[in-house]
A protein has these predicted regions:
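Short histidine-centered beta-strand/loop micro-motifs
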Residues: 17, 24-25, 36-37, 44-49, ...
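Short, conserved beta-strand element in jelly-roll/cupin
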Residues: 37-39, 49-64, 68
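Histidine-centered metal-chelating micro-motifs
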Residues: 43-45, 63, 85-95
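A cytosolic small-molecule/anion-sensing beta-strand core signal
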Residues: 58-59, 81, 100
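Short acidic-glycine-tyrosine-enriched beta hairpin
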Residues: 69-90
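Ligand-binding loop in jelly-roll beta-barrel domains
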Residues: 90-114
Length: 127
């Protein structure tokens, strides 16, 4: 039988990745839910992963560069604002910048192993 859990976000440890980005994680065997707090100007460097990702903006706004534009950010981007969701399939390269102080909810399937074991150095070294 599966373990059922009820979790309050305020009871989940806030992990500071760098001065501009922090997060809280709740996960199970098959999926991961993350509250990600980004201060204005925070950069999530270009990366990809096997995990499918939904990014739901709860407050603020993120600018995403997708695919070939992730490595050479320019005028081709997608802005995602509060109340909007960006759906990223597996292995789609992407980069993001916080246009303002932002709280987003990321959903991953399967869970991000690099986030669980702390090997997400691309994110920890960003500004």
């Amino acid at each position: 039988m599966t373990d059922v859990r009820k979790v309050a976000w305020e009871d989940v440890r806030l992990e500071e990745l760098n001065p501009l980005i922090s997060r809280r994680l709740i996960y199970s065997e098959a999926q991961m839910l993350a509250h990600v707090v980004l201060k204005k100007g925070a950069i999530v460097p270009a990366h990809d992963h096997v995990n499918e990702q939904f990014t739901y903006i709860l407050s603020g706004a993120l600018r995403f560069w997708i695919g070939e534009h992730a490595d050479a950010p320019g005028d081709t981007y997608t802005d995602v604002h509060a109340g909007e969701v960006l759906v990223l399939p597996s292995m789609v390269r992407h980069r993001a910048e916080a246009l303002e102080d932002t709280l987003d909810m990321d959903i991953f399937n399967p869970p991000r192993q690099d986030w669980l074991d702390g090997t997400d150095s691309y994110l920890r070294a960003s500004k």
